[in-house]
Amino acid sequence: MPTLMVQGTTSDAGKTTVVAALCRWLARQGVSVAPFKPQNMALNSAVTVDGGEIGRSTALQALACGLEPHSDMNPVLLKPQSDCGAQVILRGKVHGNMDALDYHAYKAEAMNSVMASWRDLSARYDVVIAEGAGSPAEINLRANDIANMGFAEAADCPVLLVGDIDKGGVFAQLVGTLALISDSERGRTAGFVINRFRGDIALLEPGLDWLTEHTGKPVFGVLPYLHGLVIDSEDSVSAAGTSEAGALKVVVPVLPRISNHNDFDPLRLHPGVDLVFVGTDEPIPPADLIILPGSKSTRHDLQWLKQQGWPEAIQKHLRYGGKLLGICGGFQMLGLKVEDPEGLEGEVGTTKGLALFEMVTRMVPGKQLRMVNGGLTSHVASTAVTGALKGYEMHNGVTEGAALVRPFAELEGRPDGAVSADGQVAGTYIHGVFDEPAACKAILAWAGLKTQGEQSVDYQRHRLQQLDRLADQVDQCLDTDRLRSLLQL
């Protein structure tokens, strides 16, 4: 079955967005299509229908296709644990920890997983839209490449090269990338897509004509800068720019190994929430609600919290009646200690927690990966909210202790998380707690948002609307006849 690969001249050129747009455009025409990312490096991941995990951006592209995410869609996922090492996920399951040099040597073997997943997807769907990583012209990474042209050559598929004009220098990026790849790779580069253009397209046309004449490659189209586009971000942490007067102030520390910060996307969109992310050495502002996010290295990030003065700020926050919520790794930090006897998240050892819950977390092999459904308990909501939670668990830790007798949620017959006796502190292992409107409304009411009215955001509906907006741009701005020909449709 046809495969088309989208590569970029740089990181953040718009590959993820273009792939999502193409997937949605094809799916709306009734084409059976699936996304594919051979290798991804990200701490934001999603649980798959087959009990694995893949990068969050690929899960978004699956949604664009109308599919549940599957491990075959992202066969190699690298989750950084330090500047020089990462946890390697192969076809959804933890393979082990590797430093950069070891992984570079391992890539030839990882390619077997990549090709096996691609073949399985190709057998199940009519079209596969693949996404590269970074740039195909990184000279130091070209040996044993599995993320860009290495995969395209093995799969014998055409490539679209995306450049971001908003950053400037797009013609140099496109021409320079072609100059640095091999003759064979240039031959399979079908053409260009220019992304994030602002202004009158007539002013750009002389440059487009020159680009085609100079390279012999067509420009498939120019996508505009889409103001107000909000879709899942995999790498960057950013807050919304506007909120209503009297909004609930929510503060989140940007942990060095923060993971799954997409948990906060519904709060970014909520008009009644003023969401603030606080980074290293930044002042900690007053808040109504502090949320400790997920972490790929709980003990490391717990030490960072202490160095940055968060325990003292949290104690002051609670004395003045503020609320505190911990999610996954953030929940683990609220206990007496976090033990890692096998060094699953870094060095072997034990780190004292914030001691706000009578509980202990122990890191054990065998990551918990599962989608969950359930409801909030009356400990955190004014009354129990049944059927309001849909999310996922993704953690190594096993947590035990007296604090768990007051659970945060009930998940199909089993408890999750904890709530303090005074109701000020809560914790949960569930990612996606704000995704469903009823749960989001109840948690924000617990945190102090008095009047919500019709403010709650239907996050899933919003995501689909944004994907449809992207697909509309394919119809309006790209050469769809040329695309169909490339895809043999």
UniProtKB/Swiss-Prot annotation:
- Return the protein name: Cobyric acid synthase
| Membrane spanning residue stretches | none
Metal-binding is among the record's keywords: no
The UniProt entry, under CDD domains, shows: CobQ_N, GATase1_CobQ
Q: Its domain of life?
A: Bacteria
> What InterPro entries does the record point to?
Class_I_gatase-like (IPR029062), CobQ/CobB/MinD/ParA_Nub-bd_dom (IPR002586), CobQ_GATase1 (IPR033949), CobQ_N (IPR047045), CobQ_synth (IPR004459), GATase_3 (IPR011698), P-loop_NTPase (IPR027417)
Task: Keyword check for Oxidoreductase, yes or no.
Answer: no
Residues forming the GATase cobBQ-type domain are 247-439
Species of origin reads Marinobacter nauticus (strain ATCC 700491 / DSM 11845 / VT8) (Marinobacter aquaeolei)
Similarity section:
Belongs to the CobB/CobQ family. CobQ subfamily.
Q: Name one GO biological process term.
A: cobalamin biosynthetic process
Q: Which residues form the active site?
A: C328, H431
NCBIfam families linked to this entry: cobQ (TIGR00313), PRK00784.1 (NF001989)
Q: Give the pathway listed in the UniProt entry for this protein.
A: Cofactor biosynthesis; adenosylcobalamin biosynthesis
Q: What does this protein do?
A: Catalyzes amidations at positions B, D, E, and G on adenosylcobyrinic A,C-diamide. NH(2) groups are provided by glutamine, and one molecule of ATP is hydrogenolyzed for each amidation.
Record keywords, A-Z:
Cobalamin biosynthesis, Glutamine amidotransferase
Name the gene that codes for it. cobQ
What GO molecular-function term can you cite, just one? ABC-type vitamin B12 transporter activity
